[in-house]
Structure formats: C-alpha cells, structure tokens
A protein has these predicted regions:
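Alpha-helical multi-pass transmembrane bundles of energy-transducing inner-membrane proteins
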Residues: 32, 36, 45-50, 130-228, ...
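Structural signature of hydrophobic alpha-helical transmembrane segments
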Residues: 11-21, 98-109, 151-164, 233-246, ...
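Transmembrane alpha-helical segments of integral membrane proteins
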Residues: 251, 451-466
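Transmembrane helix-loop-helix hairpins at membrane boundaries of multipass inner-membrane proteins
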Residues: 1-14, 29-133, 210-215, 219-223, ...
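Interfacial and helix-entry/exit segments of alpha-helical transmembrane bundles
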Residues: 56, 127-141, 179-196, 217-241, ...
C-alpha cells in the first residue's frame, strides 16, 4: 500500500484535497438547490439528492483519507506538507501538515462525518440543501484546524467553525435553540478573541528585521516565543488557554455545552462532542505546551489547571447522576471525560499524554455513538426523558445491543476502546499527582454508576408504557451507522498498539520540549506500544 501511495504522490495533494472536497460538495448542493427552486422542483426528490451528494462527498473523503494511516511514518515529524503563499505581505501562508497528534483527529473526523449524515437522513426535512451545505463547510473548518501549520490560518479555521454550528443549532435545534446557539457563539467567540491578540503579538514579534513583515508560521512562532520575557509568556499562555478552556470545555467554562447539546439536532451533537471539543485539547498540545513550557511547568499554573481538570471530572459525574434527560446526562459526562484528558496532558508523563490522546479519541467514538442512539429514540418517541422509557431491550433487541456496546465504551470496560486511555491517564498521573489521580479514579466509578443507571432505566425497567410496546427496532440505515463504530470500539480496545506506536514518538518529543526530566525511554512508556501491527 505504501508503495502505491508513493507512486501517486499521495502526500503532496491529500491535505488540500480533503479541505476542498466538502467545499465542492457544498457548491454542488447550493447550485442544485438554486436550480431546483427556479424550476419549481423542490420537494422530497430534491432533498434526497442533497442527502446523497453529502453522503457521497463524505464517503469519498473517508476512503481517500485512509491512505494517511498507511503512509504515515511515526518517526517522520511533519508529513503530507502543502505550503503556498496566501497573504504574503502579511506573512500569512496556506500551510498544511500532519504529525502524530493531528493525524488521529483528521481520521476521526472523516470517519464520523458520513455516519453523522445518516443520523439526520429522515429527521431533517426543512432547508435540507442549506443544512447539509453548512455541515460540509463545518467539516472543512474542523479539518483545517487540525491541519494548519500557519497560526493565522489556524485561527481563521477555528473561527469559521462557529458560523455553521451557530446556524445548525439556531435553525434546526430544539425549542430553546436560539438561546443555546447564541450562548455557544458568545462563549467561544470571546475566548477566541484573546487567542487572536496573542497570535498577532507573536507574529509581529517574529517579523523579519529587514522588511518588517510579520511571520505567522508555526516554526517562527515557536522560536520567537522562547525569546520573550517570562511575563510576556505568562500572559500569552493565558490568552491561548482561555480559547482552549472554553472549547474543551474545562470547568467552570462548560456552561454552554449542555444547552448546545440538548438543543442541537443529532448530527450537530455528534460533531460537537466527537470533534469540536477535541479542538480545545488539540490546541493545548499544539500551542500551550510547546510555546510556553516554563509556564506549563510552573507549579502554581500547573496546579490550578490540574485542579480545574479534576474538579470538572468529579463535577461532570455528579451532575450527570441527577439528570432526567438522556442527552443532558451524556453532555455532562463529556465535561467529566474532557477533564480527564486535561489531567493527562498536564500530568506530563509519557503514559498520561498517550492516555489523553486515547481518551479523546475514545470519547469521540463512545459519546458520538451515545448521541446517535439517543437520536434514534427521539425520532421514535419525541422525548429524551428517562421516565418515558423502560423495557426497550424486549422490543428493540438490536438497539439494546448497540446501546450496551456504546455504554461499555463510555465507562471504559476492559476490551473496549475506553479502557486503555483511562488506564494510561490514571497510572501516568499517579506518578506525579497521586492525590489528584486518586480523586479522578473515583470519578470513573461514578461514571459507571450514572451510565449504567441510565442503561437500566431505558432498557431494563418494566415495559409498562403502551407507546413502548410497539416501538420499532433499528432499521438498516441505523445499523449501518452503528456497526462501524462498534467494530472500532472493540478493535481499538483489543489492539491499541498501532495507535500508540504512531503517536508515541511525537508525544515523547513534546515532553522533551516541555519538561526533559519527565522523559522516559519508549520501551517503558507504554507496555505493548512498540508492538507490531499496522
């Protein structure tokens, strides 16, 4: 496979093609919608065309992107590079590349987007062309965040994400959709403004001494950050951190998330939980740690961040326990899971960093799966309240099977994808912060309690409501959505070595940049991570 990919010069064109394909799809959708409206041919047939064009675009993207897995060299640093001038007078370039951190998030995005489209196949029946066009634009922006090697390009993509998601929630969401959409936009936009100031400051500081032209390339920003005073680096760290903390979201910046999840359509919730939240933790790994190592290792700063992370882990679990709405419960569980990711990042051990990467990938699959399952129930019963269900395992055996698999992944049952990440985060964090790691471990038990309780209320309580006795089981489309996720849940859980092997060199390099005393040999970092397999 690698030889074939080299023969077609795969690495030289794959990233710009992945960014361009959704935009081409969106253009086709809007052109088709315009022509259909002029010809007075709008209706179910026209809407189906929009759905198939979107699904086809995402399937092509996924198929093409699988080559990244085979062509990626774990020891190769930045790969699949594409660089061209964009706004040269301002030192801004259209520069793309992937490394052992970003490649997984790109693959997660291309894997989940066609599944997400299937989730709204029948439930979205108004302005279908616009709806799917917005999702295509959203996909380009999300991928751009993970691919960008120019910091200004990173910021542009970061902000573009807000616009389609605002309209998706605000137009196709629930009863309080405008409140949730506005809250989402305001929170994330205000945090991002501070990051913009920091990026401009660094780009100007890296300006060419002869021409005075700013330089926003990642390498230039990384180099100039080390020449600034400790006070400057402290303020710049917090400017970046504000944007990332809101997006993660880290406690106490999380209050926009439950409302956005509850009001968003299923497809929006899947993208929000599985991909958008990862932009925040990706930002920590890409910018906060390597640009400001002295701030990250400063005990005062580090302890505050770790305290917020562990508070979020416990808070999310406790609040989830008292929820009566299935979707809101999963939203608060996301606060808990993402707090665990931040704990792993700032514990700064080889194990905890690998665990953080694995937890965020596993969270994307498990939480995405849970939102898909909740969406199926809502399509049938138009409610998400636990009190409306009970005994569904008897009438929906397929649904019960896939919901149990999703729950097993979420609570990190051994053999599923969730286990290896949580195990590495907790064991790695225990080396440097045993008390915080112990507290976080308690939250894992709480997570099992609230998710299993939800499972009992939906599947195993008495089947005593007439509406539930005739509820149909999953159809072929819904099985097609869930089967790939279920397969990946068990594949990663039983064979995580290929993922760990691809991320380990880059994470070791990151630790070396931040805190050389934390570096350990790769043979002791993660048992089995050097193992074979693709």
């Amino acid at each position: 496979m690698s030889e074939f990919l080299q023969s077609i010069h795969y690495g030289s064109w794959i990233l710009p093609v992945l960014l361009a394909l959704p935009l081409v799809g969106a253009g086709i959708l809007w052109l088709h919608g315009f022509v259909a409206e002029r010809a007075l041919r709008t209706g179910p047939a026209s809407d189906d065309t929009a759905r198939w064009v979107t699904l086809g675009t995402f399937l092509v993207m996924f198929i093409v992107s699988t080559g990244l897995w085979w062509a990626f060299d774990p020891h190769g640093g930045w790969q699949f590079e594409f660089d061209t001038a964009w706004l040269p007078q301002w030192g801004i370039r259209f520069s793309l590349a992937l490394d052992g951190i970003s490649i997984f998030l790109v693959l997660l995005t291309t894997f989940l987007m066609p599944i997400a489209v299937l989730s709204g196949w029948t439930s979205i029946d108004k302005r279908v062309h616009t709806y799917h066009g917005l999702f295509l634009i959203l996909t380009t922006a999300m991928l751009g965040v993970f691919m960008a090697r120019d910091t200004f390009l990173f910021y542009v993509m970061w902000e573009v994400v807000l616009v389609p998601m605002f309209f998706i929630i605000g137009i196709w969401g629930g009863e309080r959709r405008m409140y949730a959409a506005t809250k989402f936009f305001v929170y994330t936009f205000l945090g991002s403004l501070l990051m913009l100031v920091a990026i401009l400051y660094l780009g100007l500081a890296a300006a060419d001494p002869v021409t005075g032209r700013p330089d926003f390339s990642y390498d230039a920003i990384l180099a100039v950050a080390q020449t600034l005073s400790s006070t400057e680096r402290l303020w710049l760290f917090f400017a970046f951190f504000a944007a990332f903390a809101v997006k993660i979201p880290l406690f106490p910046f999380h209050t926009w998330l439950p409302d956005a999840h509850v009001e968003a359509p299923t497809e929006g919730s899947v993208d929000l939980a599985a991909i958008l939240l990862k932009m925040g933790t990706y930002g920590l790994l890409r910018f906060s740690l390597p640009l400001f190592p002295d701030v990250v290792t400063n005990p005062a700063v580090r302890n505050v961040v770790l305290a917020l992370a562990v508070t979020g882990v416990i808070y999310g679990a406790l609040v989830a326990l008292v929820q009566t709405d299935f979707k809101r419960l999963v939203a608060y569980s996301s606060v808990s899971h993402m707090g665990l990711v931040v704990l792993g990042i700032f514990a700064l051990t080889a194990e905890s960093l690998q665990g953080a990467m694995m937890v965020q990938l596993s969270h994307g699959l498990s939480t995405g799966a849970l939102f898909l399952m909740i969406g199926m129930l809502y399509d049938r019963r138009h409610t998400r309240l636990f009190s409306a269900f009970g005994g569904l395992a008897r009438v929906m055996p397929l649904y019960g099977l896939f919901l149990m698999i999703s729950v097993m992944s979420s609570i990190a049952v051994p053999g599923t994808n969730g286990f290896i990440g949580e195990f590495l985060v907790l064991t790695g964090s225990f080396q440097t912060y045993p008390v915080l790691a112990t507290i976080a471990t308690v939250s894992v038990v709480l997570a099992a309690v609230f998710v299993l309780w939800a499972l009992q209320r939906v599947l195993f309580n008495p089947l005593d409501k007439p509406e539930n006795m005739t509820i149909p089981d999953m159809n072929w489309r819904e099985v097609a959505m869930m089967a790939p996720i279920a397969a990946l849940i068990f594949y990663i859980g039983l064979h995580p070595a290929p993922l760990l092997r691809r991320m380990e060199p880059r994470l070791q390099e990151l630790i070396q940049q931040v805190d050389p005393t934390s570096v350990r040999t790769s043979s002791t970092a993660v048992p089995g991570s050097a193992g074979g397999g693709n």
